Amino acid sequence: MLRWPLLLLLAVLLPMQPAALPDGPTYTADGQIKYPTGYPEWVFLGTGLDMSYTADTTPDHSMFNSVFVNPGAYKVFKTSGHWPDGTVMVLENRGATGASSINKRGKTESSDVMGMEIHVKDSARVKGDGWAFYGFERPGDRNSSGRMIARPASCYTCHEAHAAVDTTFVQFYPNALDVAKEKSTFSPEFLKENTAAAK
């Protein structure tokens, strides 16, 4: 007799559980994040050139920083303005090359990946807001895995203090920025910073 009430209770509770994204993060047995081999085919959020968070630095070489996000996460973001559990953002660093092929001016990306970090939302593994950063020692090696960067590393404090949405730098990704504006999901920190900058 208890079977039907139990099934009804499950029917009510199960939709409340966040669904795992099919393209979400995967891990090794010891908790490292696996290299997301398909990320070049993910949603491209944006690229910065020679970005720095301090004004008094002069790079000795130019660098492109491109960000990709798994399609499942971006689909949810477009409807809600927030990143769901299972979000994987890949920051890919490539050097900039000058004249090559028919290019005589400006810069293009080099073929070698020089650096990679991953920003992941996984509430099952990470306490608090669920977000964690992972770094790769061999960024171009598809068989490699990334270790979680421990708090209180500067990447955490910087993102928490300045990120536009959910500790992510949506302010640098034009299409995602439009979504955040439409959904009014900017963080209080970002709004406060922008208000102060406008004065």
Residue positions per predicted region:
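Bacterial N-terminal signal peptides
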Residues: 5-15
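Boundary at the C-terminal end of the N-terminal hydrophobic targeting segment
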Residues: 16-22
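Sequence context surrounding c-type heme c attachment/ligation sites in exported
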Residues: 25-28, 35-43, 47, 51-52, ...
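Alpha-carbonic anhydrase
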Residues: 30-32, 37, 48-51, 56-57, ...
